[in-house]
Structure formats: structure tokens, C-alpha cells
Design a protein with these regions (language model features):
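Phosphate/dinucleotide-binding and metal-coordinating scaffold of catalytic cores
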Residues: 1-117
Length: 117
């Protein structure tokens, strides 16, 4: 379990834009998702063109959801893909798990400079 700033988490990820850890995604014991920006790193990243992550426009807000935020869920293979079983087998996963998929794939897309670690 990870404890960060009074948030009891089962998982914690840093969200990178280029080389900057601009935010954190936490998954709590109660399966709640929390996203918060790292304000110090956001200020550094702004000097290189960063503005905000889609769906998280207010950099001072703490975002909470009972489901994985669309920004993150769109970065992993969909549970409904026709070849999802092949993908899971190739990744050595027995079943579909958003958290493990995010961890394994690092949420990388060819279309942007974000990475989830």
C-alpha cells in the first residue's frame, strides 16, 4: 500500500509529459481514482509548452472518480477489442485489469508525449 499526502493508495503512478512528472494518479483502497497535478513540475513544463491534460483543465483541482478517467482508459487496450485475449496473453495477463495494463504499457501512445509510470 502507498500512502501519499494522507491518501491511502493501492497504486500510485506519475504522469509524465516529455521529461516532467506533471501529475499523479492514485488508486485508493476503495477503488477510487484520484488525479492531482504536481504544481512545481507543471510550472517547469509550461516553459516548454505544456498547458494542461485533457479532462483536467484546472491545475489546482484534485479530481476524483469511481472509474478510471478517460485520459487514462483511452491509453490502454479496450476490454471490447476483438483481439483482447491475444493482447492479454502476449502481456502475460490472465484477465483484463486496467491498472496492470496501464503499468505494463505505460499508457504510451504514438500521438502524444505522455507516459504513465
Amino acid at each position: 500500500m502507498v500512502e501519499n499526502e494522507m491518501i491511502k493508495c493501492t497504486e500510485a503512478f506519475e504522469v509524465y509529459w516529455k521529461k516532467y512528472a506533471v501529475g499523479n494518479l492514485y488508486i485508493t483502497e476503495n477503488d477510487e481514482y484520484i488525479f492531482k497535478y504536481n504544481l512545481e513540475n507543471v510550472e517547469k513544463a509550461k516553459k516548454e509548452g505544456f498547458s494542461y491534460i485533457i479532462g483536467f483543465k484546472n491545475i489546482n483541482e484534485e479530481y476524483k472518480s469511481e472509474k478510471l478517467f478517460p485520459f487514462f482508459s483511452s491509453r490502454i487496450p479496450s476490454k471490447n477489442r476483438h483481439n483482447i485475449q491475444t493482447i492479454l496473453r502476449d502481456l502475460n495477463l490472465e484477465e483484463y485489469n486496467e491498472t496492470l495494463l496501464l503499468k505494463i504499457t505505460k499508457g504510451k501512445l504514438f500521438t502524444d508525449r505522455y507516459e504513465v509510470r
